[in-house]
Amino acid sequence: MMDWYAIQTYSGSEQSVKKAIENLANDHNIRDRIQEIIVPTEDIIEVSKKSKTKVTERSLYPGYVFIKVDLDTVLWHKIQSLPRVSRFIGENKKPTPLSEADIGHILEKMNNRAAPKPKIFFEQGEVVRVVEGPFANFTATVEEYDVEHRKLKLNVSIFGRNTPIEILHSQVEKII
């Protein structure tokens, strides 16, 4: 019977584990027992210091691969022994199938991919430090964040007065 299982992997190795499982299925002629292997991802926007943007993929569930498989003990041990596989998720060291609700939520999240999100997000009222431009080294409060144009409207305190400024989000850093 085909069920969904979660496999814990080394973080960042999800795609290589997926490929290793596909190779295992092809090499051992068991492709009919493995119906689907997924690594849910989302698109994010990364901005370099020179304000160049690129869209990259990031795993929604770092360190996990989901597999729909007709699992028996032999296949379980073969998959478990693949490089970068930590374990199947389950109780008492035995794999436990995911519930329909859990896998439904994962698949829905994967299928409802929105527009790429910025890697760094600023919230209204957040305090940031300006790192470039005439207001470098000033602290400011975020009033508005325009994700599409990657601009921030900030309030900077200059000589005791709040002064509104608008700058690119690459010109500020979060204060931790």
UniProtKB/Swiss-Prot annotation:
Matching CDD domains: KOW_NusG, NGN_Bact_1
A biological process from GO: DNA-templated transcription termination
Family matches, as Pfam families: NusG
Entry keyword annotation includes Transcription: yes
Entry GO terms, CC: cytosol
Entry keyword set: Transcription, Transcription antitermination, Transcription regulation, Transcription termination
Main function: Participates in transcription elongation, termination and antitermination.
PANTHER family (alphabetical): RHO-INTERACTING TRANSCRIPTION TERMINATION FACTOR NUSG, TRANSCRIPTION TERMINATION_ANTITERMINATION PROTEIN NUSG
Protein family: Belongs to the NusG family.
Name this polypeptide is given: Transcription termination/antitermination protein NusG
Species of the source: Helicobacter pylori (strain ATCC 700392 / 26695)
